[in-house]
Amino acid sequence: MSMDNLVRIIEKDQIKDVPEFRPGDTVKVYVRFKEGNKERTQAFEGIVISMRGSGISKTFTVRRIGANGIGVERIFPLYAPIIEKIEVVRRGKVRRAKLYYLREVRGKVKIKERR
């Protein structure tokens, strides 16, 4: 058995079921974290602006406009144990794989809805 096959077998065990989403979609990511001795879940809702990597190491970047109009971006590993669940709020229709141009856009961003 080659090392590549061994890595694939181990990755298959780690992969959990997540909904299908693409850049342009608005998602709500529920993140679990420890605060002292208790665990809390916090939701982070925003537009997926990029997805990169493959397999177990796949990551996605979510951007939202926070308080005072300041943009906040978070990069999440797709199969991380800290992610409780991912909800697709809205499906967006875009023609790019990376939506980094949204960083310069001020105000509300218009993304057409995919059916």
Swiss-Prot record:
Identify the keywords attached in UniProt to this record, alphabetized: Ribonucleoprotein, Ribosomal protein
**Xref: Pfam families:** Ribosomal_L19
In terms of domain of life, where is this protein from?
A: Bacteria
Instruction: Please list which residues make up the signal peptide.
Output: none
Asked if Ribosomal protein is a keyword of the record, the answer is yes
InterPro entries xref list: Ribosomal_bL19, Ribosomal_bL19_CS, Ribosomal_bL19_sf, Translation_prot_SH3-like_sf
Quote the protein name from its UniProt record. Answer: Large ribosomal subunit protein bL19
Recall the GO molecular function terms of this protein's record. structural constituent of ribosome
**Family assignment from sequence similarity:** Belongs to the bacterial ribosomal protein bL19 family.
Instruction: Return one Gene Ontology term, BP aspect.
Output: translation
Gene Ontology CC terms: cytosolic large ribosomal subunit
Chain's role: This protein is located at the 30S-50S ribosomal subunit interface and may play a role in the structure and function of the aminoacyl-tRNA binding site.
